[in-house]
Structure formats: structure tokens, C-alpha cells
Amino acid sequence: MPLLDSFKVDHTKMPAPAVRLAKVMKTPKGDDISVFDLRFCIPNKDIMSEKGTHTLEHLFAGFMRDHLNSNSVEIIDISPMGCRTGFYMSLIGTPDEKSIAKAWEAAMKDVLSVSDQSKIPELNIYQCGTCAMHSLDEAKQIAQKVLNLGISIINNKELKLENA
């Protein structure tokens, strides 16, 4: 079985918080789709809390769209990684990592400004599969940590695994 792209990078060298361009591909019609690794935690050293990650999932995509979508960029999806060290973001277009980092920072500030758990989008039994598994406080702790540490840019060449 061929390795997925995410398993071709050395996770022991991965900084966080950091942005990494994971993949660019073309659609049959020629549009570029970019996939970004938005790494919140250093792999195998730290993870995001379950409830905080779930709440971020509800907030992060909307806030990132507010700051990143344009005539040349449209976010398709932002989904948490199973390892709970970050999110993958797929989008149409090819923005640079610096613009992603700037939007991510602004989105984290937006998370901190959410006043109450009742303001979390789609937090109900009809639109969320585990609506009891949320914590705005934990999401805010994750956001504050990102802002405190600052977001760096990952160079894929520095992370490439040999023989992968």
C-alpha cells in the first residue's frame, strides 16, 4: 500500500504552531487544490483536548473563511487530524503560507472573542453528532497558546523522510 503524503514527513522534526503546504493537485478542469497542515501541537509531545478540538472544529472553518476566502481562494474544508495535533485545510487556490498564518492568527483572535458557548455554530443535536462534547474554555486555551507561541512556516525539504 502506498504511503499517504502525511507519512512521508518526519514528525520528530515538526515544529508547532506551524503551517505546512502538504499537497497541491489539479482538478480535471485545471483548478489548483491546496492542502495545508495547520499544526497546533508538536507531534508525540502534546495534543489538543478532545472537547477543545471539537469546539475549534465548529469555529475555526468559519473564521478562516472570513479571513482567507477571496476571488482567488476558497476554503473547501478544515478538519481535525485524528492525532489531535492539528487540522488539515483543503482549498481551491494557491495562497502562500504567510497568508495562511496571518488568517490563522486572526481566526485564533476570533475564537478568543466568542463570548459564550451558546455562540458556537451548529451546536445542537440536529447539526452535531456529539453536541455534548464541547468546551469553549478549552478552545480558547488552544487559541491563546497558538497566539503566545506564534505561527511558523514549515519547510517540507527539512522534514522529508529518507526512503519514503
From Swiss-Prot:
Q: What does it catalyze? A: S-(5-deoxy-D-ribos-5-yl)-L-homocysteine = (S)-4,5-dihydroxypentane-2,3-dione + L-homocysteine
Its cofactor is:
Fe cation
User: EC number(s) of the enzyme?
Assistant: 4.4.1.21
Which keywords are on file for this protein? Answer: Autoinducer synthesis, Iron, Lyase, Metal-binding, Quorum sensing
The UniProt note on the cofactor reads as follows: Binds 1 Fe cation per subunit.
Q: Which NCBIfam families does this one have?
A: PRK02260.1-2
Please state what the protein is called.
S-ribosylhomocysteine lyase
Tell me what organism the protein belongs to: Campylobacter jejuni subsp. jejuni serotype O:2 (strain ATCC 700819 / NCTC 11168)
